[in-house]
Amino acid sequence: HLLQNLEKKLFPEEQVASTIEKKDLETLCGFIEDVGKKTEHPGMVLIKPGSFKMGSDKGLPSERPVHQVEVDEFWIDKCEITNYQYLLVLARHPFLRKSTFPRKYHDGNYLKNWKDDLIPELRSELKPVTNISWYAARHYCNFIGKRLASEAEWEIAARSGGKEKYSFDGGVEFLPDYGWFRENSGGMIHTTAQKISNQNGIYDIHGNVWEWVYDWFSVYSNDNSSNPQGPEMGKYRVMRGGSW
């Protein structure tokens, strides 16, 4: 089994998380190599087609104006991608490794906490992978037969049918139950899927680490839209979800 072989070869005994925790997350988050064209996708949830009001009149200027968006059905991962999942892809695709990934595709900080091409930071295998450029994230998705979600897809999945600021019923006092942020993270990245999921079954949609989406950044339009993908060109790509 590739997971077991990589674990024995690349992680010293004291670095590996408990077998129970690893197996639980493997089942929950779908630590797999290729979803292909299966009808059921381990570690993913199906988001039904729908229409929602995207943005927030109470948020930052970049979140305005609120506008109506329609989105087709799509699948999205339940969990943020871990160092361990990323390692599996690096083992098969040297192009994405720290020493070989072209400099033009990142800012110089790519996988800066990894000790080597196939050695993540100590005790980080079940934590979300960080210091990943948009291009690296897109290549990773392509290698395993997936793609980056659009910003609209991310938001409808995060909202879970809600219309308020958070993806759950209740105010900011409930936020520590759903995510890691400045006040409760201890200034550290945490193992994925340790908090309560949203109604769609997605974990860490609030905090822990930022998540890349497909779109170039642009100001929102008042116009209604269907399956928006953002502008064709831009200066910055969009991240969603927040971090600590």
Where in the sequence are the language-model features?
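Pro/Ala/Gly-rich low-complexity, hydrophilic intrinsically disordered segments
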Residues: 2-39
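Surface-exposed recognition segments
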Residues: 61-69, 162-163, 185-188, 205-244
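Disulfide-stabilized, aromatic/cysteine-rich ligand-recognition loop
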Residues: 12-15, 19-21, 26, 128, ...
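Structural recognition of the beta-strand scaffold that forms the well-ordered cores
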Residues: 46, 130-131, 147-149, 165, ...
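Short, well-ordered junction/capping motifs at the entry into regular secondary structure
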Residues: 123-126, 179-206, 230-233
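Mature N-terminal segment immediately following signal peptide/propeptide cleavage
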Residues: 43-53
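Short, polar loop/linker segments at the starts of domains and inter-domain junctions
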Residues: 54-73, 189-195
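Active-site microenvironments of metalloenzymes and redox enzymes
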Residues: 3, 12, 51, 56, ...
